[in-house]
Design a protein with these regions (language model features):
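N-proximal low-complexity "stem/linker" segments adjacent to membrane-targeting elements
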Residues: 1-23
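Short beta-strand/loop segment that forms part of the nucleotide-sugar
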Residues: 8, 20-21, 29-37
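Acidic helix N-cap motif at the loop->helix transition within catalytic regions
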Residues: 15-19, 40-49
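Conserved donor nucleotide-binding strand/loop of the catalytic core
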Residues: 29-32, 43-71
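A conserved acidic beta->alpha catalytic loop
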Residues: 35-43, 85
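Acceptor/aglycone-binding surface of glycosyltransferases and processive sugar-polymer synthases
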Residues: 57-59, 63-71, 89-168, 195-206, ...
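Short beta-strand-to-loop acidic/aromatic patch adjacent to the donor-nucleotide binding site
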Residues: 75-86
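Catalytic donor-sugar/metal-binding loop of nucleotide-sugar-dependent glycosyltransferases
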Residues: 142, 164-166, 176-193
Length: 228
């Protein structure tokens, strides 16, 4: 059995994290919740639900992911999903399948290909994602449909990508670098539902604009970099 670690960045998600952890299927051999500076009981709830909790005081989605990766050095495959219950953790089996069957190095769960519940994402967030994906496809020659956080990658591929982005450009950096370095990338449909609690990013137009600007900059920088 392959060693599969699930990394879940979390910031003030005490209402959702217990449900997320409860829904993770047994294919995961280790689950790590990265507390990214929560001021609520996220860490306590996660521990009570059976997860290992590590702390990353430096704010940022990418920073939390990097801390989670460092915490699972023995993992052969690392999966990422959100802590807000917007993803369906049970679909981890489908996300992992192309890697486990030897057909992919990186699998991205595409919300565009799956079923999106009403009010799962505000319109400005959907349009912003389409803009970012469109730019990536144009500059890199990919045929992606999403930059969603629910994904899985082999440890070897992840090491080769030398991930650096500290914030929300993390997923875009991974996909651009994977494409430029010739990794086998596949998308699988994943469903999406309204998150529990308020969003720290896409809940406001300003938040989405800030995140979107960072993602666009990440795409352009890595797409035009000689090193990839």
């Amino acid at each position: 059995m392959r060693r599969v670690a699930v990394v879940i960045p979390a910031l003030d998600e005490e209402e959702a994290i217990g449900l997320v952890l409860k829904e993770i299927p047994p294919v995961a051999t280790e689950v790590v919740v990265v507390d990214n500076g929560s001021r609520d009981r996220t860490a306590e709830v996660a521990r009570a639900a059976g997860a290992r909790v590590v702390v990353e005081p430096r704010r940022g989605y990418g920073q939390a992911c990097l801390r989670g990766i460092a915490a699972v050095p023995e993992a052969e495959i690392i999966a990422f999903l959100d802590a807000d219950h917007s993803d369906y953790p049970a679909q981890l089996v489908a996300v992992l399948e192309p890697i486990l069957s030897g057909d992919a190095d990186l699998v991205v769960g595409s919300r565009a290909l799956g079923r999106r519940a009403r009010r799962a994402q505000p319109l400005h967030a959907i349009l912003g994602t389409r803009l970012c994906v469109g730019l990536m496809n144009l500059l890199v020659g990919t045929r992606a449909t999403d930059l969603g956080p629910f994904r899985a990658i082999t440890a070897a591929a992840l090491k080769a990508l030398d991930m650096r982005d500290p914030d929300f450009g993390w997923t875009a950096e991974m996909q651009v670098k994977a494409a430029r370095r010739g990794l086998r990338v596949k998308e699988v449909p994943v469903d999406y539902r309204p998150r529990i609690g308020s969003s720290k990013v896409s809940g406001t137009v300003l938040g989405s604009l800030r995140a979107g600007a960072g993602i666009l900059g990440t795409i352009a920088r890595h797409a035009c970099s000689r090193a990839g």
